[in-house]
Amino acid sequence: MRGLRLATMTKAPTSLAHWGAFTADVRDGDIASVRPIEGDEDPSPLLGNLPGSLRHSSRIAGPAVRRGWLDDGPGPSSRRGADEFVAVSWDDLTELLAGELRRIVDTHGNEAIYGGSYGWASAGRFHHAQSQVHRFLKMLGGYTFSRHSYSLGATGVIMPRVVGTHDDLFKRSTEWNVIAEHTDLLVCFGGVGLKNTGLNHGGTTAHPARNALRRFRDRGGRIVSFSPLRDDVDGDCEWLANVPGTDVAIMLALAHVLATESLVDRAFLDVYCTGYERFERYLLGVDDGVPKSPQWASAICGLSADLLTDLARRMAANRTIVTVSWSLQRVRHGEQAPWMGLTLAAMLGQIGLPGGGFGHGYGSINETGLAPLRCRLPVFPQGLNPVQTFIPVAAVSDMLLHPGEAYDYNGLRLTYPDIKCVYWAGGNPFHHHQNIPRLRRALARPDTIVVHDPYWTAMAKHADIVV
């Protein structure tokens, strides 16, 4: 919005935020109200946070440098997050930042700059903060980067080995309209939280999930929700409050019923899958002597064996989608839930049929269930990174606290680099990173932290140079 002359405008053009498309009404140089784009059947109420945001007290008024860094120069500091900031001119900031980047590159090499810069700063493509900072750092000679996401760290590693890229898994998911018209039974591990469908990376112009589920129910469709939370599904459902973390045991029990009652679609497995025979040996306990039966799972998950047996039979008798929320893979051994969910759906043999199959992310983000784009949208080119060093995105604290230490990732033996500069644009790891006190200790280690942001987020307050 900085490029708009808001003081002289009364109506801004249509804009796109993560929560949807909208038109802003402007008064006295600030956003007075917003109106969702016409045709959005269930606009997100979070758009209501935009009024007043341009002049909010948390806005960063201009470039600033942390007092300790300005007085003492670059170096590790436990004062980050508590020190005061000094306003500087754009010319002075540019000179300070350029000099520090050149010092780090000349002394330690480009690998010493961490530019993962994870965050959701902008729904636009040209104004996408990560794209801009990555392009900038590549032009500088490269940087240590990050892979995958906090939302889908385990999925991003396992699913390409099982079914293809997880990106295609979401973009080619069964559309909500197809579910409303064809699905009989929606079996949800982790629920379908409609609150999460309010937003989408890159923005969105439609929120179809709520009305699609209403039409699904009106047609007689049933929802089974495995979750410790009743409101993980909006409206009527069969809520099964299993012990948290036992979803894979439940899936195995359902698969056991299919296998022992001849409900497996062998023809589908023979044509489209490989490895079922090996999996079935484990499922039936041939090698370890432990059949993964409903009775076995009942002692683990807290649900009755009869209930699980009945559900498996209903799944085989109806057009069924097995959906696994992203939350299930954000734990240790998180790769097991989406992998087993897909296996269960393959045993039913309904993948590819209207209203049947597997889903991963319904109720986790708005994209899952949207009609796919017919062509790829343009993106801002970033160029090539000469530095090949990377970390899994959620390992930033480990990297800063243990430089030079070896670790295992996705079949590789890697080493954490020695980072001297953390460069972040439009992101705030304090709102999604695990173990915040440990993150604070880690951020005391680099020589310099640079943050680009319009607001004084926790990350901006831990910076040395704020742009």
Which residues does each predicted region cover?
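Extended redox/cofactor-interaction regions of prokaryotic respiratory oxidoreductases
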Residues: 129-215, 219-226, 249-252, 346-462
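A glycine-rich phosphate-binding loop feature that marks nucleotide/adenosyl-phosphate handling sites
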Residues: 118, 271-275, 314, 357-369
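Conserved short loop/turn motifs at secondary-structure junctions
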Residues: 116-124, 296-300, 325-333, 364-365, ...
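Flexible, glycine/charged-enriched surface loops at secondary-structure junctions
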Residues: 108-112, 264-269, 352-359
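N-terminal export/assembly segments and adjacent metallocofactor-ligating motifs
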Residues: 1-263
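Long, well-ordered, tryptophan-enriched scaffold segments
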Residues: 217-225, 229-317
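Gly/Pro-rich turn-and-neighbor structural signature
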Residues: 109, 123, 303-305, 309, ...
